[in-house]
Amino acid sequence: MDENTRSALHHSQVIDLTTTGRRTGQLRRIEIFLHDKEGLLFISGTPRPDRTRDWIHNITADPHVVVHLKRSITADIPATARVVTDPAERRPLMSAAAQRWGRTDVEEMVQHSPLIVLTVPDDEQTNLP
């Protein structure tokens, strides 16, 4: 991955994310916000206590995704997604997202927001131990 793409990837921004449909096998693309916290890339959403979003189900079935950068640079970046369920791991990431969005309901987000962490094969920053 070239330096311009790496730099763009590590700026919190709106992206498109492609997952593979768990039942159909068809590619599914959504617009969502990508966060960077000290080199760790993660994606979250607003709390929905009534259901789990389809894209989370898709990632659980097949963690291979594509991040589509579309703001300062255009690039399609393959990645592996991991659904984060442990509250202790979720809390600092949800706190960062809440702060960025001007929200104060961190505990609600910890309990009910979708959260995935991304690993990008060609990016040393997302592959830290």
State the predicted function of each range.
Residues 1, 31-38, 69-76:
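Short low-complexity stretches enriched in small and charged residues
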Residues 1-14:
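Short, basic/aromatic recognition patches
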Residues 4, 21-24, 103-107:
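Short helix-to-loop capping/linker segments positioned immediately adjacent to catalytic or ligand/cofactor-binding
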Residues 9, 24-26, 59, 110:
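A generic structural micro-feature
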Residues 12-48:
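Short beta-strand segments
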Residues 48-123:
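Short, structured beta-strand-loop surface elements
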Residues 124-129:
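Conserved alpha/beta cores of soluble small-molecule-handling proteins
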